[in-house]
């Protein structure tokens, strides 16, 4: 006969087991969209056998400690400055507890996920699964969703998904599921010209057309060129079927940077990425990025071409890249983070983005964390800020639609350096399309406080309610972004947009890195703590011009509510059009030598 205390223990034990069993049979919603995102139309369900490559992000218990570590590594004067992490050290720091990984892996296998398709990468788990398996496992239904502006573009998505309640605290997100983003090239306009006549007067000519020599003159670079070095590689992101053409690049160098004749770039293929040389598609973005990243720096340059809409397991439903449903950002980031330190680029320049609100919050946070991981490993991640000024549609996409300025992502991630655009010289001015503002997702980092709060004090209550004053300020810096000469398909044209500003700024950073490496110092890595600290005196404040937007138009259906006179003005100090200003290479070179 059991004693009373023994009976109590047995009852408690049975109760705990019953609770665990109950939790295993209940589900908790991880992500849910209130409606189908604007610009998408729900279509038919995919075939049950259609294969999807899933990315599962685990909850990071050490997220705050990790982010502080990244800031410390990147802050001049800190004892850890420049001590970038190896891949193994980073993975070990972020790796979840073994029991967490084991429980999720067991769940995947119980759901029928083939063990050989599972890649356990520490804080992320990747796996392939059929639609029917995913629907059972995530208690959801997938459909094809078509781009209302381009019916040839469609993807497999759902509006919500759930996981077992006992696993929910450890799962941050699973994608592709609720991510309906439309990454766009940040090119405001393209003007095709047969020839561009250049005069010997750099000042006069550079108000009409920007070339590498113009940028050298404007930003006081002189004849500085980076020494090609595997430790100082500029990585250029290629998405959306943009191809970097060798013949166009050679012609550009011959005409606009003849001192670099013989320079070249290499290509790395991610997923099903291609770099077609005979495609008839417009590749101005790829040409622009390569021309100025390399033509202004001479640094070793790599074009990372990622399949247009992410990696694809081909099948009858998605037979080719035109019908690809997955996410290129995640694919590129996981590829780069898998590289050993001696193969990792020192700089990653990307001229693509989308409205921040179009990106699910958990996706935004998880992707931003991956950019932070690149920062921890010493990569300067540079993004164009966008070409919609204060915003385009300026309307929230939730159930309650209200007017709102639209920040862009990934430019709004605090761990990337966001580059706005200027035009003209003497004086250099903010250009109207340069995107900026304040993130609705990411809180302003402390090192931005002095600069941004000074601006907000001057702004007062203007535009109150249309932005979040607590948000990360965008952009960080600016560079010329109007009428860049570029070669595409054998013809010279001019391109405007922050997509021109980003590779130009990346090239300047490569030249600064070269100075540090020649002095046996590490590359600059994550730039923002430096920009808002010791580096700030190396930027020219832009106080003329401003951005515009919210004009009552959007690219999906043409109509949107207008916000009269919506704008951000360039002003003394940091502003949400040009950041802290444009680089002065002479001053920056002196600063980085002494860090």
UniProtKB/Swiss-Prot annotation:
CDD domains: Peptidases_S53, Pro-peptidase_S53
Protein name per the record: Tripeptidyl-peptidase SED3
EC number: 3.4.14.10
UniProt organism field: Arthroderma otae (strain ATCC MYA-4605 / CBS 113480) (Microsporum canis)
Binding site residues for Ca(2+): 541-542, 573, 575
All residue ranges annotated as the Peptidase S53 domain in the record: 209-595
Recorded GO MF terms: metal ion binding; serine-type endopeptidase activity; tripeptidyl-peptidase activity
Encoding gene (name): SED3
Cofactor comment: Binds 1 Ca(2+) ion per subunit.
């Amino acid at each position: 006969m059991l004693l009373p205390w023994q009976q109590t223990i047995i009852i408690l034990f049975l109760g705990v087991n019953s609770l665990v069993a109950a939790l295993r049979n209940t589900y908790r919603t991880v992500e849910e969209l209130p409606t189908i995102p604007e610009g998408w139309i729900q279509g038919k369900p995919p075939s049950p056998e259609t294969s999807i490559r899933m990315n599962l992000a685990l909850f990071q218990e050490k997220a705050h400690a990790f982010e502080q570590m990244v800031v410390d590594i990147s802050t001049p004067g800190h004892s850890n400055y420049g001590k970038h992490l190896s891949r193994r050290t980073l993975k070990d720091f972020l790796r979840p507890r073994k029991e967490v990984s084991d429980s999720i892996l067991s769940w995947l296998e119980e759901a029928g996920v083939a063990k050989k398709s599972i890649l356990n990468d520490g804080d992320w788990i990747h796996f392939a699964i059929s639609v029917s398996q995913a629907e059972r496992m995530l208690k959801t239904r997938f459909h094809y969703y078509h781009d209302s502006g381009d019916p040839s573009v469609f993807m497999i998505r759902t509006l919500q998904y759930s996981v077992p309640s006992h696993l929910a605290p450890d799962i941050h997100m699973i994608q592709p599921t609720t991510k309906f983003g439309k990454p766009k090239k940040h090119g405001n306009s393209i003007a095709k010209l047969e020839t561009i006549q250049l005069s010997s007067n750099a000042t006069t000519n550079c108000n009409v057309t920007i070339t590498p020599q113009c940028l050298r003159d404007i930003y006081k670079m002189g004849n500085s060129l980076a020494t090609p070095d595997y430790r100082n590689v500029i990585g250029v992101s290629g998405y959306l079927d943009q191809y970097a053409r060798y013949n166009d690049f050679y012609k550009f160098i011959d005409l606009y940077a003849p001192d670099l004749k013989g320079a070249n770039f290499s290509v790395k293929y991610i997923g099903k990425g291609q770099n077609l040389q005979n495609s008839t598609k417009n590749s101005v973005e790829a040409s622009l990025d390569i021309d100025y990243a390399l033509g202004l720096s001479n640094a070793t340059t790599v074009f990372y071409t990622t399949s247009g809409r992410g990696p694809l397991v081909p099948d009858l439903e998605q037979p080719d890249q035109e019908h690809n449903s997955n996410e290129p950002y995640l694919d590129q980031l996981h590829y780069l983070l898998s590289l050993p330190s001696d193969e990792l680029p020192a700089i990653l320049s990307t001229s693509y983005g989308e409205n921040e609100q179009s990106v699910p919050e958990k996706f935004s946070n998880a992707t931003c964390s991956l950019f932070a991981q690149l920062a921890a490993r010493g990569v300067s991640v540079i993004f164009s800020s966008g070409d919609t000024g204060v915003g385009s549609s300026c309307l929230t996409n939730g159930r309650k639609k209200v007017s709102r300025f639209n920040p862009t992502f990934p430019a709004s991630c605090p761990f990337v350096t966001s580059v706005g655009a200027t035009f003209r010289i003497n004086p250099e001015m903010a250009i109207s399309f340069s995107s900026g503002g304040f993130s609705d997702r990411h809180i302003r980092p402390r090192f931005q406080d002095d600069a941004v709060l000074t601006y907000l004090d001057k702004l007062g209550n203007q535009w109150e309610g249309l932005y979040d004053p607590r948000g990360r300020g965008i952009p960080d810096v600016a560079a010329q972004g109007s009428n860049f000469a570029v070669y595409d398909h054998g013809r010279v044209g001019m391109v405007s947009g922050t997509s021109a500003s980003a590779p130009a700024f990346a090239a300047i950073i490569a030249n600064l890195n070269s100075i540090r490496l020649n002095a046996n110092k590490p590359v600059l890595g994550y730039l923002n703590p430096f920009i808002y600290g010791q580096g700030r005196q190396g930027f020219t404040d832009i106080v003329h011009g401003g951005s515009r937007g919210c004009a009552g138009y959007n690219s999906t259906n043409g109509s949107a509510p207008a916000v009269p006179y919506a704008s951000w003005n360039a002003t003394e100090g940091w502003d949400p059009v040009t950041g802290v200003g444009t680089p002065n290479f002479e001053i920056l070179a002196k600063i980085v030598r002494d860090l």
